[in-house]
């Protein structure tokens, strides 16, 4: 085995900011962290927003953080992936969308767009619908019909009118599209096999059955008058002046379902695409030979084309270490064990050859502010023993405390949590240095740095503040502007391993 040793130490939820009020990171006595910060090259990293594949300004989290760290690149979450594709012009070149549009032009049939009508960004984004309308216009598709699912859950409960008006303005401006049905997500986006709900949405879309209105806004107005708000609006059909539905989904039509989150998109998709569907009677005129497009991969059961296929994360840090014959150890307590294993390996459960894992049980307490040290000392003891035994070249370690205790929004226990972690950090890093190894000390996102809101209430969420990075190697400098995706390349650099082409991050050590 190579005698090289480098460790990646993640202080979970340890963000940096200058203001000390409500900031447990600043208030804690942490002589070891401060000693390393003052002695060794250090910088800050961006751990939120587009730097970790989330929408601009969105706080990071442990899952996303560890995915980015392990992948050595920005791992785009679905919403951001589509946003970036629209911005960069790739969206309008997407072959799956273009094939659907070609299908309806060749067959002389209709294109139906359906999905959640809001900018909540949890299941869908209305801007993705607008991008599809623009693409349909550009491709010369004339018969485009929208089946809008009303939200009221990821956005305010009475906001549907705003989104319908905005959509109507876009339709007018772009010059294509017409609203055909509207239904509350309670019906169209059920995920709990309540098929009576799904059937109502299906029958409105496929058969034009349900309450009928000429003006889409009247659907909402009428519902509100009956005390029924957005999420629960009964699937309703928009009609022409003669009372006929504007459009129903028929044989040989194309559908693009623009929700990106799968769980609530699967049932309604199966209703339209699955030949063996038996959960309710779809009737004699069930639309056949649909060209059905899902924005992302919904499920193996959905028989449709996928516009944004799953991204396989090849050559994550664990795989590269393994390929180079290096021995690695992943260690954390229960709360963050999946993060240093599954998420660090890009969503892979199995170990790589040469990978060892140590799981230390988290304490059995109702909330961790009751035991701020959690299992940090046990993690430290187990790890120091491993370092002494000289069995591993690479160590990936997570101290959970700043995040898990920080979620209490209580300053005093979180200060204690950080002080416990600092004590453990000192023993671990000094043991590594004594073996001639290197440590990278960093974090995956902020949390313990903001525990009080501007109104003086407990702040229990993550933050968008930068996180520290210290590399315990003297005589080098670290570059500015780093991101979490640069940490794996830095670890490989310390071990003298070339980073693979898939890792678009780069070592923080300036050459």
From Swiss-Prot:
Reactions the enzyme catalyzes: (2R)-2-phosphoglycerate = (2R)-3-phosphoglycerate
Xref: Pfam families: iPGM_N, Metalloenzyme
E.C. numbers: 5.4.2.12
Residues the entry annotates as binding Mn(2+) 1: 403, 407, 462
Full protein name: 2,3-bisphosphoglycerate-independent phosphoglycerate mutase
Catalytic residues identified in the record: 62 (phosphoserine intermediate)
Disulfide-bonded cysteines: none
Organism: Bacillus licheniformis (strain ATCC 14580 / DSM 13 / JCM 2505 / CCUG 7422 / NBRC 12200 / NCIMB 9375 / NCTC 10341 / NRRL NRS-1264 / Gibson 46)
